[in-house]
Amino acid sequence: MHRFYHSNSLDLNQIIILDEFAGHHALRVMRVKVNDPLILFNGDGFEYKAQVNSINKKTINVEILSKEQNDNESPIRINLFQSISSNEKMDMVIQKATELGVSTIQPIFSSRSTIKLSLDRTKKRLLHWRQVAISACEQSGRSKIPIIKSPILFDQIAEEIESLKDSLSLVLHPDNHQQSSNLPKDYSGDINIFIGPEGGFSKDEVLLLKQENCINMQLGPRILRTETAPLAIIAILQYKYGDFA
């Protein structure tokens, strides 16, 4: 059954007009028809079973028939601090990290980041990244959308870590010898993952993270790309502490 995101509140027996993006996708791609069943979600953790009530040239009216709790969220909260990379790579990270169950994504500008964004472009990229996450939720069956925060400079990370000081914080870096097999056996708190850009974090950045009690970690003997490393460690964490086991 097709799933669509709706940005407003949803109630039983309510008749709503699908959002512009969802409506266009339903009409032009999915080719939905009157009386077709749909599933809607708005980020509140519920799924709303619905039915197409009527179709106009550019809009689809949908009636909400039932409401069910969606229990497929990960039992662990993973916060991804991802150095900003090129458009395609960043989109891939956000899409796959959403599918894998992350809770928040914090884009960061590190000293070796090759991507520089103006304020206007940053706003546009943030809206785009949020739409990528929504599309990934539609595909993967999630009903809660990960929070994608506004990009920050690396110097601002210490403030973020301070608010998460009771969490397990991991820094992926190819020059470290700590392996994922050395992670705590049992853990149920928040987990923060720090991923550098192409070329990795600088020595000063690694030192700063170490001073904030972050654990430096290496994933095997091969060097992973900035878009590959987060997906590998998220999968490991979901297997070890989450719902992949």
Stretches with model-predicted labels:
Residues 167-205, 215-217:
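Active-site/ligand-binding-proximal alpha/beta "capping" segment
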Residues 38, 62, 145-149, 216:
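Generic structural signal for residues in well-ordered beta-strands
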Residues 203-245:
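Structured adenosyl-cofactor binding patch, chiefly the S-adenosyl-L-methionine
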Residues 71-168:
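RNA substrate-binding interface of SAM-dependent RNA methyltransferases
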Residues 9, 67, 110-112, 221:
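Short, ordered loop/turn segments at secondary-structure junctions
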Residues 38, 63, 69-81, 185, ...:
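Mobile, glycine- and charge-enriched loop segments
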